[in-house]
Design a protein with these regions (language model features):
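Beta-strand-turn-beta hairpins that frame and shape the catalytic cleft
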Residues: 1-4, 11, 16, 123-137, ...
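Phosphate-binding glycine-rich loops of NTP-binding sites
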Residues: 438-461
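N-terminal pre-Walker A segment at the start of P-loop NTPase domains
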Residues: 408-430
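Conserved catalytic scaffold of divalent metal-dependent phosphoesterases
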Residues: 100-208, 243
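Core catalytic region of metal-dependent phosphoesterases/phosphodiesterases
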Residues: 19-127, 212-220, 228
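Active-site environment of divalent metal-dependent phosphoester hydrolases
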Residues: 10-15, 56-59, 88-102, 142-146, ...
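Conserved beta-sheet core of the metallophosphoesterase superfamily
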Residues: 191-269
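Accessory, non-catalytic peripheral segments of nucleic-acid enzymes
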Residues: 265-416
Length: 461
């Protein structure tokens, strides 16, 4: 039994150029959708799973929403139904998938008996030409609903409560499974220990997570996840995978191949073996260019002489450059953008300095330097020496003396170091004091509204 596993389509407008009123990044996404359909028409899978986040934005204008729903149906969902025995469409997160959009899809596809749309947790048996298969569907939900029952809860505890709820839900659904029939879980959540597209690892408390032990305890043969945009095999005994997004969505996806999984369930003694293969898609690549001070100097001297060649062609580019302070002043960033565009860059997202070298340390002022020292350093930095420097110092001397006669020297300069504060807190109307004497590092904790911030604000005021 072959199972096509995709998700995180994010159909909609993305940051990028437009042509004839059409967002070209949206067309990139549609191109990836069509590529999946073409592969599916060749493979003819028994089950195709769309594991959530079919759309990119939940809240959009009516005309945009209708265009997204129409393209999702005409160019993706309906064609998949035409070449798959069964198609599973899972609701993702509330900020991407709109419940009303899914209601519209349900009404528009009432005649498609092989399309199964899940907006609530469920277990369902589907019949394919290779035999029956059970689908355990665990769509995303809005954890903000829990705030009605636990007002004032902090984010970490909210995540832990939602985590407990989701894992208990999965274990409850597992009791409905018939273990004589292959079972596939599809869910749109973070799995504990999974790797995000930026390389960080999700742990319990940071998000609503499904535990690998819960996946194993569910007793399914395969778990097909959406939500994390980096394709990966998860750390559970049960074969479990993130399909990843179909296209690169931002620079966190740079260098990561995107596509979809094709899983094959093969009956064997004591269960089902799973063989999985990853199929790439024609994604739009992101590329970060880092320019050295030498390259920046070349742009300053002769912008026309700089070329990036095929490196940037058809890619979304961001530029990070390092240079001196003088080069930063002389650099025209538009010259960099022109060079990238001339070499075929699809879109230049940003051009920003990564490191601008300031004056040498010997030229830096300190809190011990007075006006005369500052003037001397300025003259030295600007190569003003000899008689001209002496003349400027002589002209400046009476002005500096008049501005600073030394009477308040040292009284209003230096670091602000609090020793002790005594205030009447306007939030709680209580007397409060705090001694900083023995403190090197401190954290002010407490529930919202007790006056943590005002303790210090009142003291400053």
């Amino acid at each position: 039994m072959r199972i096509l596993h995709t998700g995180d389509i994010h159909l909609g407008d993305l940051a990028g150029p437009t042509k004839d009123g059409e967002n070209l990044r949206r067309l990139d996404t549609i191109g990836c959708m069509k590529a999946i359909v073409e592969d599916a028409q060749s493979i003819k899978p028994e089950v195709s799973i769309i594991a959530g986040d079919l759309f990119n934005r939940s809240r959009v204008w009516a005309d945009t929403a209708l265009d997204d729903v129409n393209d999702a149906l005409e160019k993706f969902v309906i064609p998949l139904c035409g070449c798959s025995d069964e198609v599973v469409l899972l609701f993702g997160t509330m900020n991407h998938d709109n419940p009303r959009a899914f209601e519209l899809i349900k009404k528009a596809t009432e005649n498609l008996s092989n399309l199964h749309i899940y907006t609530t947790p469920a277990v369902e048996k589907l019949d394919t030409k290779e035999g029956p298969v059970q689908i355990m569907a665990v769509p995303g939900f809005d954890k903000a609903r829990l705030r009605l029952f636990y007002p004032g809860m902090d984010k970490e505890q909210e995540n832990r409560n939602a985590t407990a709820l989701i894992n208990d839900t999965i274990l409850g659904l597992a009791t409905q499974l018939d273990h004589s029939i292959p079972a596939v879980m599809t869910a749109h959540y973070t799995v504990n220990g999974s790797e995000a597209d930026n390389g960080s690892t999700f742990l319990a408390g940071q998000d609503v997570v499904i535990l690998p032990s819960t996946i194993d305890a569910a007793g399914v043969d395969l778990a097909c996840f959406g939500h994390i945009h980096k394709p990966q095999r998860l750390a559970s005994e049960t074969p479990a995978y993130y399909c990843g997004s179909v296209n690169q969505l931002n620079f966190n996806d740079e260098g990561t191949e995107h596509g979809f999984w094709l899983h094959t369930l093969q009956p064997m003694m004591g269960g089902n073996a799973v063989a999985s293969g990853f199929i790439g898609l024609p994604e739009r690549e992101h590329l970060t260019l880092r320019l050295s001070p030498d390259t920046v100097a070349q742009f300053v001297a002769d912008p026309q002489s700089v070329s990036f060649g095929e490196l940037v062609r058809d890619k979304i580019i961001r530029v990070r450059y390092s240079c001196t302070a003088e080069q930063e002043k002389a650099l025209n960033r538009a010259d960099i953008q022109k060079a990238l565009t001339a070499d075929g860059a699809f879109y230049v997202a940003e051009i920003v300095p990564e490191d601008v070298e300031e004056l040498d340390s010997k030229d830096q002022l300190t809190e011990h330097d007075g006006p005369f020292e500052a003037l001397g350093r300025w003259l030295e930095h600007n190569d003003i020496t000899g008689d001209k420097a002496d003349r400027l110092k002589a002209l400046a001397e009476p002005i500096i003396k008049k501005a600073d006669d030394g009477r308040d020297d040292g009284k209003h300069t230096g670091a602000f170091i609090p020793h002790k504060i005594e205030v009447k807190n306007y939030r709680s109307y209580t007397e409060a004091e705090f001694d900083f004497g023995p403190v090197r590092m401190a954290m002010a904790n407490g529930q919202n509204g007790v006056g943590k911030s005002s303790l210090f604000m009142d003291a400053i005021a």
